[in-house]
Regions:
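Short, amphipathic, aromatic/basic-enriched membrane-interface segments that mark the entry/exit
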Residues: 20-28, 80-88, 145-147, 197-208
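Active-site His/Glu-centered metal-binding helix of metallohydrolases
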Residues: 36, 62, 66, 70, ...
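Multi-pass membrane catalytic core of lipid/isoprenoid biosynthesis enzymes
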Residues: 26-32, 73-131, 160-163
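Topogenic membrane-insertion module of multi-pass membrane proteins
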Residues: 1-65, 233, 245
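Alpha-helical transmembrane segments of polytopic integral membrane proteins
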Residues: 39-42, 59, 97, 122-125, ...
Length: 256
């Protein structure tokens, strides 16, 4: 037991940052910003401020999207940063949305619903672990795709009913059966082999550059001017993209 503790200590020492330059710190600072906004979302959930929860998660997802890109741009990727990012993602996109939905449903004492909530958190952890283990194993044709729904997208899907209720005042969605099945669907989709668009190395054809810029501009404007409406639109666009991702992925796989 003592030897195991020594080995873990040595491993932690090896993973410590070798330098503290601005180049190294910036991506990790962005990751910590994502974690801060995720924790702020949790704080807002405790008081039932569901719109604020969604806005905090949106901001956290922006920082989460930037940290990896900045690290690659500055050539400052590290194992330390990868682990920090995974831990942050687990909290922000795994634990926080699960807690928010549980509180939104008025803390039901139903054991089955609690099991469903726990299932989502567990699948989030499994999804992140699988992603880290597959970083160097993906074939070239699959670089534009994720295996399963990523945790940030899963968090958006989890909070989708909260946004619908707040925007449309549709309380019929607040049903154990509907929300339970929705959470199970999201959980399974995270650990499935469903191909989903990555966007990390996605190249837009020249003929589609202007239409894509227009769509991005409209989405950005919608999110800024009306975050909840923009959030709903973004989630609907993502849901619509899922079958297209599978079609394009299978075509590339056949050609490979």
């Amino acid at each position: 037991m003592k030897n195991r503790g020594v080995k873990l200590a040595k491993k932690a020492f090896q993973l410590r940052p070798k330098r503290f330059s601005v180049v190294w710190m910036l991506p990790n600072f962005l990751t910590i910003c994502a974690l801060i906004f995720g924790l702020q979302a949790m704080y807002q959930a405790l008081f039932g401020n569901w719109d604020n929860v969604i806005i905090m998660i949106i901001i956290a997802s922006v920082f989460d999207m930037l940290d990896g890109r900045v690290a690659r741009l500055l050539k400052s990727t590290s194992e330390f940063g990868m682990h920090l990012d995974s831990l942050s993602d687990f909290v922000v996109f795994g634990a926080v949305p699960a807690l928010a939905v549980y509180l939104w449903m008025d803390k039901p004492q139903d054991n089955i619903f609690w099991i469903v909530i726990v299932l989502y958190v567990i699948c989030s952890a499994l999804r992140l672990a699988r992603f880290n283990s597959e970083l160097s194993e993906r074939p070239s044709y699959a670089k534009n795709y994720f295996n399963g729904v990523p945790t940030p997208a899963a968090a958006f899907l989890m909070l989708f009913p909260l946004a619908i209720e707040g925007y449309l005042n549709e309380y019929m969605l607040k049903s154990f059966d509907i929300i339970g099945f929705w959470i199970v669907f999201i959980s399974i989709s995270m650990v499935s082999n469903l191909p989903t668009f990555s966007g990390k190395v996605f190249q837009v054809p020249k003929s589609l550059v202007i239409p894509m810029l227009i769509i991005l501009a409209l989405l950005s404007n919608a999110i800024i001017s009306n975050p909840i409406k923009g959030f709903i639109t973004l989630v609907l666009v993502y849901i619509i993209s899922l079958p297209f991702a599978s079609i394009f992925y299978l075509r590339l796989k056949k050609k490979a």
